């Protein structure tokens, strides 16, 4: 029975269909211009860029230029790349220009499609970023598509690992910049740790097109980019805690795979308490006393490391390091580390060198980084299942772009077996049958461990010539995946490894030329060999087509339908035939976690025998229902995390904007005066509360504050004895004295040096306090969840307390800055050590018995204003001190070493 909604869609079409229809009409208008542009010479076509830029300067909009700009880019692509964007690619290009996400099937030409909106938006000269998932794709696309942009007079840069700041600055200054999401995000964080605007590498965030947008904005949304610095080494402690976990019995802990949590039971808590007590690490009477918060945190991390994280699935051990594996792509993520001690717990578990824990210096999530762009769009093969999330969080509408040719892939129903062993036997049988008839096969697995187990089975069964593509062999990824379409090829791949590289039936011409002709120079011989490779690929393609096209065989369903759809989408590109099938067992993670017990009972009642599978559309629907539940739960988690991160993000914006303002300021006198006055007001109100009786005044405390925060000695005791004096008069007198001292210092330093000193002190203090604030916010976030048990909203509690922490940080900033500026003095560099005659230091005056060594030096350097004899130093005037050795007693008379007194502020 057709629902009313279904009936309406049949009559009127879906909103997606109606939108595509409108855009198709615009695409036809662009195609109508094609003849005119074909008749232009190269020079006339190239001149269009200057023509469009002049029109923009006169006030025309990008939208008004779109038809002609797209027609120009299409004609340039035909001439430079030998490729003509189809009308569906024009439609996709318009979606990208209009802040949308273009869902385009694998092999339909997303990379070429992106050149149209990239060219149009680059005309403004504000910078366009094309974001990809790895350095290989960024470099490949920048080189290939760069030829098109260069032909049209635009500059192209690429951001990749290993570039220095000058190279990065040059790449960002280009009209078009290709780079990975990680590199762009880290450059933003590093820029906001710089002290001069000239040192920064990025321009303001104008327009970004994110390739594989679902991977970056959904799968990686929960992973923050963190720049951190090392703390003290605590490897012995991690190793000790790790020894407590292996002896535990199942009754000692509970693991919830659905929620991905592991906790100690009451029995387990008692056991580890005894172990900690024996090791001398238990403070107080109970493990959960406040003094043991850090110990509990490390114990929980050790339990998670052992019971939730699996080697070769979640991470691998390589070169004495734990390398995280991306759960969505199966790729290694070198350089990425779990935070808050979890990575160290994994290192202890695997007995590799434990790296020191890190303190966060700066962090941002991809969600908040990409929301900074004035205009954002994306493209992928699979986004429709996450359309709600893209709309809610990023304000991006997903549009499914029709394929240029009808899809001929056959998606078969899942085969469900009772055990993993039965499932793998069926997979091997199916691979053998397809391999023998010459059909190329892509086998999708969910982890490195499972891909290698399957490879071992194929070896035992005598199936040869297969390739394993997983995080261990990341370097060969593109080549292996490009050749997966050769007849009879068997490629075992973890999840979406090789994403971004097409699987072309018969093989990939570009890859084969690169591999086979790398040492053959340009010329007739090379052309002849390329022609031979083309003919060979065409012949192999015919064989692959005759065998049924690419067969995607999946060994397990993923939690997300989108990941399954990505795998399916590798087959049937550009109208080619193909097929896909999922092999499942009731022992698979998804089935086991989401209620396979009922299904197992049902299959037993049906009398399912060993090695028999059940195949029915109902099972597919039941699995999709389970996946939808997981997706909805993950969306809620990401949405909730974003609400918390938005609190920090608002504070981050304020701090980073303040830093930028500081960089641009040429005179900070007023800013510093305001800070100084606020510090004085806070100081006075604390010690002399408004309307309080004189007996309640803390004059001794006020005097101490003035000395420690303002470096002044004021007669506040005398002022307090005056008749009728109130807190306002105290404030005014202290401000007047502090302003006078600051003005004298500014006159001594000169305006240029004073501004430099003020800027340095403010920015360094701001950075240090911001780092401490990030740690405080992390701690607050880790405990605020428990407020829910007291019927209080954890998010509101977090917002309130995070704001209070922020206010405290700003108050501390004022105090630290003013305290340092009131003490700072310029000390000129000491001259080179004087060359003294031998034994000069032992020459003692026979009359007085004093060593005249010091006097000899002063005599020799009496015209050098950097060295002042101790006798001529005025303790109250640092200007008379000259160069003071750091280990010398401080000339102020405090009794401390210089480096611990006035020298601390140099």
UniProtKB/Swiss-Prot annotation:
Name the reaction it catalyses.
Answer: ATP + H2O + cellular proteinSide 1 = ADP + phosphate + cellular proteinSide 2
**Any idea which UniProt keywords this protein has?**
ATP-binding, Cell inner membrane, Cell membrane, Cytoplasm, Membrane, Metal-binding, Nucleotide-binding, Protein transport, Translocase, Translocation, Transport, Zinc
Quote one Gene Ontology molecular function term: ATP binding
Q: Where does ATP bind?
A: 89, 107-111, 502
Broadest EC class assigned to this enzyme: translocase
Q: Where is this region: Disordered?
A: 868-887
Topology with regard to the membrane? Answer: Peripheral membrane protein
- A Gene Ontology BP annotation from the UniProt entry: protein transport by the Sec complex
Q: Which PROSITE patterns match?
A: SECA (PS01312), SECA_MOTOR_DEAD (PS51196)
Disulfide partners: none
**Which cellular compartments is it found in?**
Cell inner membrane; Cytoplasm
Name the cofactor(s): Zn(2+)
Question: Pfam families from the xrefs?
Answer: P-loop_SecA (PF21090), SEC-C (PF02810), SecA_DEAD (PF07517), SecA_PP_bind (PF01043), SecA_SW (PF07516)
| Binding-site positions, Zn(2+) | 890, 892, 901-902
Q: Which GO terms describe its cellular component?
A: cell envelope Sec protein transport complex; cytosol; plasma membrane
EC number annotated for this UniProt entry = 7.4.2.8
Subunit: Monomer and homodimer. Part of the essential Sec protein translocation apparatus which comprises SecA, SecYEG and auxiliary proteins SecDF-YajC and YidC.
Q: Which family does it belong to?
A: Belongs to the SecA family.
What job does this protein perform?
Part of the Sec protein translocase complex. Interacts with the SecYEG preprotein conducting channel. Has a central role in coupling the hydrolysis of ATP to the transfer of proteins into and across the cell membrane, serving both as a receptor for the preprotein-SecB complex and as an ATP-driven molecular motor driving the stepwise translocation of polypeptide chains across the membrane.
| Protein's name according to its UniProt entry | Protein translocase subunit SecA
